[in-house]
Every structure is written in C-alpha cells, then in structure tokens.
Amino acid sequence: MRKFASGATRDSDEGKNDYDGFLSYPVLEAFGDYMTVHRKQADGKLRDSDNWQKGMTQAVYMKSMFRHFFDVWALHRGYKRVDKKTGKEITKKEALMALLFNVQGYAHEELRKGKK
C-alpha cells in the first residue's frame, strides 16, 4: 500500500505492467506516423485506422514480415532499397515501422486464437 503526503492511498504497483517504462514514445509516434501515411489505399480511399484488426491470416503477415525484414537487413548492411511500386528509396525507419506493423498484426491474430 502506498500512502501519499496528501493522505491519499493506493495499492502498490508491484507486479503490474509498467507500460510507461516498457514502451518507447518516439517509436510509437513514428509508428503512428507510418500508419497514418499508409491509411490511403491503392484506390484512393482512406481505410479505418483499425481496419487491420478485422483480421488477416498470419500467412499474409508472415510474407510481408519477411519482405520488410529483408529491407531492414539490407539497410543495416549498407545496401540501398527501393520500393518497386513507387521507385522511392526505402528508409530504415519506414522498413522498421512496416516490420513492426506485421509483427503486431501476427501477434494480434495469435492472441485472438486464445479468445475464440
């Protein structure tokens, strides 16, 4: 039990998840920026921000995860990567955020299995 100078009390935070310590603000902000840019679909329509939570197969996430990991790996090794659709150079930040999206999506589907 914690007691504060004001007289307020609160349970101990022992054993509770410390999201403030576990998560990185700059990474989450970069991820949000990445997701905002990629909300626009090929047909020009804007998809809902939680569209991915409707469900995709883990195989889809895995294939994409491999492609984006390959980009991260190549960039890490000093190679240049170019998006074959747009011709734009892929940055390490973009490749990492794409990888993070797919890891999160794969994990989301894995955790949903236990709730069905």
Predicted regions mapped to residue ranges:
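Intrinsically disordered, low-complexity regulatory regions
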Residues: M1-K116
